[in-house]
Amino acid sequence: MIMTVSDPGGSSMSSSSAITPESEQAMAAVNDAPVGGQLLQQRLALVEDLWQTVLRSECPAEQAERLLRMKQLSDPVLPEGNAVSSDALVSLIRDMDLSEAIAAARAFSLYFQLVNILEQRIEEDGYLESIVRSQDTAEQINPFTPPLATQTEPATFRELFERLRRLNVPPAQLETLLQELDIRLVFTAHPTEIVRHTVRHKQRRVASLLQQLEAQTESSTFEAGTIRLQLEEEIRLWWRTDELHQFKPSVLDEVDYALHYFQQVLFDAMPQLRRRLSSALASSYPDVQLPPSSFCTFGSWVGSDRDGNPSVTTDITWRTACYQRQLMLERYVSAVQGLRDQLSISMQWSQVSAPLLESLEMDRLRFPEVYEERATRYRLEPYRLKLSFVLERLRLTQIRNQQLAEAGWRAPADGLLSSNPEAPQSESLHYGSVAEFRSDLELIRTSLVSTDLTCEPLDTLLTQVHIFGFSLAGLDIRQESTRHSDALDEVSRYLNPDQAYGDLNEQERVQWLLQELQTRRPLIPPSVSWSPTTEETVDVFRTLHRLQDEFGSRICRTYVISMSHSVSDLLEVLLLSKEAGLVEPSAGHADLLVVPLFETVEDLQRAPEVMEELFQTPLYRNLLPRVGSQGQPLQELMLGYSDSNKDSGFLSSNWEIHKAQIALQDLAARNGVALRLFHGRGGSVGRGGGPAYQAILAQPSGTLQGRIKITEQGEVLASKYSLPELALYNLETVSTAVVQNSLVTNQLDATPSWNDLMARLARCSRRHYRALVHDNPDLVAFFEQVTPIEEISKLQISSRPARRKTGTRDLSSLRAIPWVFGWTQSRFLLPSWFGVGTALHEELVNDPDQMSLLRTLHQRWPFFRMLISKVEMTLSKVDLDLARHYVTSLGSADHRQAFDGIYTTIAEEYSLTHRLVLEITGQERLLDADPALQLSVDLRNRTIVPLGFLQVALLRRLRDQNRQPPMSESPSDGDGRTYSRSELLRGALLTINGIAAGMRNTG
């Protein structure tokens, strides 16, 4: 037997891990919810039945029964309704060998992923019900309900516009905002996206079959039975599929994964979003003009984010752009073929506009082969003939795009297409820009409208072209600030060793950079051989120039500077851009938007000072793009949630970001600059995650003004965009929240006493957090030993290393994502709440009457309510008894006393935070205000416990072997087998997969 699950310290599972009857109350509350209730219980029962059926068919009988018994013992509410001690569960796990442990890890992982599919279906139902409800009850909407403080359901466009109408928001004010509405969602490759693309495909198949099964009526017994068999078959195939990545994904693998959501969901979802907005606007504000189709667009870091990822090269970024264009061209070809089939209009029965006929004559001269092939067939069908020419141009554009992908960014553009013997000699025959393609489609639409005809598929395609263009999503380049200063230092040392850039102070650097920006001569000699890092840094800007020449400026116009500290960080990028021809300071022209990313608390505090100096610098200000009807200069600025949280803790990080937004918006307004804030939010609360709707509504009043940019990280892509209705749910809630925040003003952020209170809480929380995380010399060892952080690094889930190359293994080298991942696996979830309890407690010790103010803040201030809501949700997922098991089982003997002290500190802080959150919210249990979420967390918390025991046992055995000589492996605990390190590692990694699925987020 390999399992040793008894606590070496003598503790056993109790208190928070005990099965409690309160879950029955949660289930009863869910029964009364609009969506859920009996349907929820039926769906849970179906998932349970499918899971049990598959286990019984795929596992040996005795093993299957033990796995089912494990699940039964971990259920919050057993069929007989009795609370059960965890002793029986411990005993059951202790008797397992490695093969059974692996089967258990896989079984529970499968269970959680099935439950995740179920919850996605429930979210879809909730969204669809909200649409129906908003149509039926618009007249009952109370505009004076304080939506910014208390609304928990995402608003639909219909609900939003009706509320605005009743609040007497003038149509002109709404129209002005809608015309300048600018929502950008940026997909990133998340290192903790743990599920294989193959498994995601099976999940979508299961979700589709579940939806089909629910659609069956009582009379369709045969069809329902057939679908049920298909479900069992699909899940059995899933069971026999390896959950673990067998190799580290390449960057292009990650690109393919991200593009899937555009291909399968978003390409078709975006026109639906616009139609819903149009319908809702017509109902409440019929005279208000629709926003441009591109009011909501997408960006991507996948294939372009090179911060700490040496695998992202200039060639990779170039190929990524080609891949994205190829995907769009394929979708456009399919759409145009559909239009050609549909638009069978004959000139015998309908007139055609003169411009369309003239364009056909031009096309005949340019494409004689196409005309000869199609003219007879479509002699009297001008739309079909025109679309045949459009298809030919798309085909030639595809050929050119493929050649570009193969040739690379350094290849000359001239002659690429003509080198293909199948292509015409004239390069201009392909679409040189998306504007040419759009012009052809508009020509067809105008002709149809002139004869009183409409074509919804054509309108849909035009919307898609406006949103996606040929590039699909703009690629943001991201690079760490020191890469630019190091490159300029190397260049300057070559040119003048006595005045090296790296030896200058900040003021001297700014002076030198401004001087170089204003001179017309090049700085970087073209024939010098630089170091590989400098060559790559400089080549990025050359690649950008070539990308924009070939694909248009839309493909890659944003350059994000991570770890921005100073004015020189931005001017360095402008100078390197000037060298590549992207910036012409003398002409006040720039084809690149330079975006500082302020990440640490100190940098967030310094950000207004940095931007003030830049806004007061004429050269910099003149290079900003102009937006809006007033032609204001636009500055995009990114706020980092991850590193500021890791640096200072949850409460301090959120408060500093909140303050920075207000200060930066005030600064921008004083300088006549439009500000677009870019929120670098992760999937977990510890990295800025949580419900987007509440998060946007909680932004300081006046900081959005219709503009926002948000990262959508790989871990959450599946939960938001895997299904069409889920995608629409997310897109509509984000859009309505931005409009609502921008128009419904909230002056509570400016309440002095509230701000003073938050400042005190943030300072105290930061002090307590840093005392544990940064000042305790044993914390690094604690984290490395009592969490599976080392094993997490063995997961083949990302092209980016888990640590920065700093030469050390301290916390500064560890990225924020695995930092959160490790704490989540061991059920501490420390980054998302630690320090909050002490801050609240000290405030109340100094003045007990402050509890009344804290409750007022929770009821009325969206920002504070969001903070407490996130802390509450995180606390509900913490399991300190299980976490204690990690400490006592995995901590080394020589650290026992120190680790016990750290655990005690964490446990005391948890108890304090838990108690005070309940006092502030006025609840008896965490999440009482959200019974559906409470039930979901209860179900998951208890069912994850067996995986925690399994993980600890496997980690303990694996680490024991790692401490032995390579050829010396002890037999397992009495079962006569010797397990290799790779076998034990595989088992441990499977438990990581399972717990990640159960927690629904990782890092």
From Swiss-Prot:
Q: Which GO terms describe its molecular function?
A: magnesium ion binding; phosphoenolpyruvate carboxylase activity
* Cofactor(s) recorded in Swiss-Prot or TrEMBL: Mg(2+)
Tell me a GO cellular component: cytosol
Q: Give the enzyme's EC designation.
A: 4.1.1.31
Q: Which InterPro entries match?
A: PEP_COase, PEP_COase_bac/pln-type, PEP_COase_Lys_AS, PEPCASE_His_AS, Pyrv/PenolPyrv_kinase-like_dom
- Which SUPFAM superfamilies has this protein been placed in? Phosphoenolpyruvate/pyruvate domain (SSF51621)
List, alphabetically, the Pfam families matched. PEPcase
Annotated region described as Disordered, given as residue ranges: 1-24
Tell me what reaction this enzyme catalyses: oxaloacetate + phosphate = phosphoenolpyruvate + hydrogencarbonate
| Active-site residue list | 190, 646
Q: Which UniProt keywords apply?
A: Carbon dioxide fixation, Lyase, Magnesium
**GO term, biological process aspect, one:** carbon fixation
Q: What does this protein do?
A: Forms oxaloacetate, a four-carbon dicarboxylic acid source for the tricarboxylic acid cycle.
Protein name as catalogued? Phosphoenolpyruvate carboxylase
Q: Which gene encodes it?
A: ppc
